A protein has these predicted regions:
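P-loop NTP-binding core
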Residues: 1-263
Length: 263
């Protein structure tokens, strides 16, 4: 839940990597972050009307675009910063919980706002994988994502605030399950990202993360590399820019282990 932990880059890399490994799989990304960095990376930013904000406010089908690398995307909006005032809700817990189910309702809508010309109707039925990029701060946007999701992946950068934030995210996940907002929600695991194994602080924080959440850490990590930073600067995924860099290799290994992708 901390900005800069590599969550957006991880969503981009996982989605692009899955399509690269198996072109028959259909992958959708949804941008809930008001910063709209994911939308920028996939070239669907600045859609003033056809975005997730308007879909959630109107509680209608979501607009789906097809990007150049074969991934599909639902654009975000800077207005997501203020969406809480437009969601249903009230003082009671039951009324509050109603505001957490808006995204799920949009995704279940059989009148998907298809911008691809492919006849899309229902997001859940039309895609094999759906990735939701959440905002850095815990908010109703986060709850909406967790209520709609089947699994949660927590990217963890080897920085003190990122490691500390893991417990907060796990607490929110437990709350969603405790109040039966999504009984099927599962933790996919913690994914160490932007790892520089040469530094002392990385070794110290890796040890701390292992002591606190050792059984939750995935058996893979994503190393930091210059090629990855260059790819981001060029608005490309690591698989488009440098698939055989250390970061590209790490993401491919992570994808195969997490999703059991058949090539």
């Amino acid at each position: 839940n901390k900005g800069g932990v590599g969550k957006t880059a991880t969503v981009q890399s996982l989605a692009s990597g899955i399509v690269r490994l198996n072109h028959n799989l259909r992958v959708l990304v949804i941008d809930l972050d008001p910063q709209c960095n994911l939308s920028s990376l996939f070239g669907v930013r600045d859609n003033e009307y056809d975005n997730i904000y308007n879909a959630m406010c109107k509680q209608s089908g979501v607009p789906v675009y097809k990007c150049k690398n074969g991934v599909y995307a639902v654009p975000g909006s800077a207005q997501m910063e203020n969406i809480e005032q437009h969601l249903p809700g009230g003082p009671s817990l039951r009324e509050q919980m109603k505001s957490y189910t808006v995204l799920l309702g949009c995704l279940q809508d059989n009148d998907c706002h298809d911008m691809t010309g492919e006849g899309l109707k229902n997001v859940f039925d039309d895609f094999d994988y759906i990735f939701i990029d959440c905002p850095p701060a815990l908010s109703k946007n986060t709850y909406n994502a967790l209520v709609a999701a089947s699994k949660i992946l927590i990217p963890v950068q080897m920085e003190a605030l990122s490691v500390k934030g893991v417990s907060e995210v796990l607490s929110v996940m437990d709350e969603v399950k405790e109040f039966h907002m999504n009984d099927n929600l599962e933790l996919l695991g913690l994914l160490p990202v932007m790892v520089d194994e040469r530094t002392k602080i990385t070794k110290q924080l890796s040890k701390l993360l292992g002591e606190k959440h050792g059984d939750l850490i995935l058996p893979c990590r994503i190393r930091r590399s210059v090629k990855f930073l260059e790819a981001q600067a060029h608005g490309q995924s690591i698989f488009e820019y440098a698939p055989y860099s250390s970061t590209g290799i790490d993401y491919e290994i992570a994808i195969k282990r997490m999703f059991n992708i058949k090539i």
